[in-house]
């Protein structure tokens, strides 16, 4: 498969994720769409790395996945805290949380 096709796929995935972030109000769905956008960026990094014949993009994608794993833990903890306090996972309720 041509590496340009992977870039088209990455652009499509990023667009789907951005649309989900802008349209949906459920925090879990918004969080999943953000992860989809992050994975689209990883796919673009790997495709550019493959096109240019070096490993820099693959290394960046690996470190991005490591950071995304930590982001998942923190993000889900915030969503669980929001759900326990408000009995809703709506993004609109997140502004009501206090420290």
Curated annotation (Swiss-Prot):
The keyword Translocase applies. Keywords: Cell membrane, Membrane, NAD, Quinone, Translocase, Transmembrane, Transmembrane helix, Transport. The keyword Amino-acid biosynthesis does not apply. It is found in: Cell membrane. One of its GO terms (biological process) is ATP synthesis coupled electron transport. Pfam families: Oxidored_q2. It catalyses: a quinone + NADH + 5 H(+)(in) = a quinol + NAD(+) + 4 H(+)(out). Its EC number is 7.1.1.-. NDH-1 is composed of 14 different subunits. Subunits NuoA, H, J, K, L, M, N constitute the membrane sector of the complex. NDH-1 shuttles electrons from NADH, via FMN and iron-sulfur (Fe-S) centers, to quinones in the respiratory chain. The immediate electron acceptor for the enzyme in this species is believed to be a menaquinone. Couples the redox reaction to proton translocation (for every two electrons transferred, four hydrogen ions are translocated across the cytoplasmic membrane), and thus conserves the redox energy in a proton gradient. This is NADH-quinone oxidoreductase subunit K 2. It comes from Streptomyces coelicolor (strain ATCC BAA-471 / A3(2) / M145). The lineage of its organism: Bacteria, Bacillati, Actinomycetota, Actinomycetes, Kitasatosporales. The gene is nuoK2.
């Amino acid at each position: 498969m041509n590496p340009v096709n992977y870039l088209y796929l990455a652009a499509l995935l990023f667009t789907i994720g951005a649309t989900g972030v802008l349209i949906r109000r459920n925090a879990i769905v918004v969080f999943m769409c953000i992860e989809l956008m992050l994975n689209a960026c990883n796919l673009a990094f790997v495709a550019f790395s493959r096109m240019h014949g070096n490993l820099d993009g693959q290394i960046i994608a690996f470190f991005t996945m490591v950071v995304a794993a930590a982001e998942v833990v923190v993000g889900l903890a915030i969503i669980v805290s929001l759900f326990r306090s408000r009995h809703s996972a709506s993004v609109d309720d997140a502004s009501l949380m206090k420290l």
